[in-house]
């Protein structure tokens, strides 16, 4: 059990609702959101645009007033406290650095507003700029820094007065792909060294999985699932979560047989799942939707390989760490595309070739057939 799992609850949100009312209509942005954030953890709100993650963050910061519900911070009702009394640091999508000020002055600005002594301001600014690794930039203006450096200065400004809570609203959205990877690692390092409880908002699944202690997946103003990155990825609670987090294949089937379950597909093919640790046994003699990740499948160049699904290679993509195969199979005479990830190219298999797809189903999971509707609404 990690230190965060043992930690006390820093922030508690209960039954939070937010309705934006217009002259002719209203929009419910948050619908009964409840969260507990532990001391020192990096907690991510993850979801597509319009799911309510930024509205949740703005309610925590005090920029939006909830329509109902309660926000407790360190055991104190925080719901109606104005933003300037919440001791919260925040980094926005646009870093909001003052262009006419030096880096030192940007970071020191909040401390001067708080009327700290000159000596204490210098000590704090020097310490935090060293933490973010930009000691040599103190006299420069923001326009003289790269995007990644500006992001770190915005982070330093949010941390310099030792906030009890740090809020990050899609802070990497303006950076290129390679810099995003570097900066998410830097944010994690800085957050851990500062030991500050942090709530991070993003729509980027890879970003959330790589830096978070826990993740709340949101959809349509509700929390769909809360868990560690591996729990969210490996054991999603619904088809919607499974489809949103990473790549996934969904295949309609029926579970038959005793002992090792036999999955019967609409293509009239069957595969046997051995040593299953998933929930397949609970679907005995019932229909379900098989959920399997691309890396849990394997391609054989022998189209007659036993215990497999037959298909045809449509596209082969080299992605660096993996080779992704787009395979067309048939269910009820209807074509369906599935993804299969391999460590390297399968020898002798090219676009247009017939192949067999093996399912390593030890961790495969079934969802109720009625959840198939969620795929059309993600």
For each feature predicted by the language model, list its residue ranges.
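The feature captures the beta-strand-to-loop junction immediately N-terminal to the Walker
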Residues: 46-48
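Pre-Walker A (P-loop) beta-loop-beta motif of ABC nucleotide-binding domains
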Residues: 33-44, 98
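Non-catalytic connector elements of ABC transporters
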Residues: 248, 258-378
């Amino acid at each position: 059990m990690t230190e965060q799992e043992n930690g006390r609850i820093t922030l508690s949100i209960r039954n939070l609702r937010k309705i934006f009312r217009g002259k002719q209509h209203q929009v419910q942005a948050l619908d009964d959101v409840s969260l507990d954030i532990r001391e020192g953890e990096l907690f991510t709100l993850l979801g597509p645009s319009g799911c309510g993650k930024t509205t949740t963050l703005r309610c925590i910061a005090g920029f939006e007033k909830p329509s109902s519900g309660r926000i407790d911070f360190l055991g104190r009702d925080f719901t109606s406290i104005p933003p300037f009394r919440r001791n919260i640091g925040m980094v926005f999508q646009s870093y909001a650095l003052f262009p006419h000020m030096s880096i030192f002055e940007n970071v020191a600005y909040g401390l001067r507003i708080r009327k700290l002594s000159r000596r204490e301001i210098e000590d704090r600014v020097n310490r935090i700029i060293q933490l973010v690794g930009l000691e040599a930039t103190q006299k420069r203006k923001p326009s003289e820094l790269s995007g990644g450096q500006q992001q770190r200065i915005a982070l330093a400004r949010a941390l310099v007065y030792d906030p009890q809570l740090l809020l990050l609203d899609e802070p990497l959205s303006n950076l290129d792909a390679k810099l995003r990877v570097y900066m998410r690692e830097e944010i994690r390092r800085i957050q851990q060294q500062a030991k500050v409880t942090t709530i991070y908002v993003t729509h980027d699944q890879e970003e959330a999985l790589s830096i978070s202690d826990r993740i709340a997946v949101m959809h349509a103003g509700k929390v769909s699932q809360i868990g560690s990155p591996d729990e969210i990825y490996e054991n999603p609670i619904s088809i919607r979560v499974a489809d949103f987090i990473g790549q996934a294949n969904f295949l309609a089937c029926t579970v038959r047989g005793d002992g090792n379950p036999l999955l019967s597909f609409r293509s009239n093919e069957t595969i046997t799942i051995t040593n299953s640790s998933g929930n397949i046994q609970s679907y005995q003699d019932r229909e379900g939707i098989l959920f399997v990740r691309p890396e849990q499948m394997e391609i054989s160049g022998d189209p007659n390989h036993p215990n497999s699904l037959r298909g045809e290679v449509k596209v082969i993509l080299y992605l660096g760490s993996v080779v992704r195969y787009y395979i067309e199979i048939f269910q009820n005479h209807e074509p369906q595309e599935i993804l299969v990830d391999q460590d390297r190219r399968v020898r002798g298999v090219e676009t247009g070739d017939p192949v067999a797809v093996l399912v390593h189903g030890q961790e495969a999971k079934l969802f109720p057939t009625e959840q198939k509707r969620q795929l059309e609404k993600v």
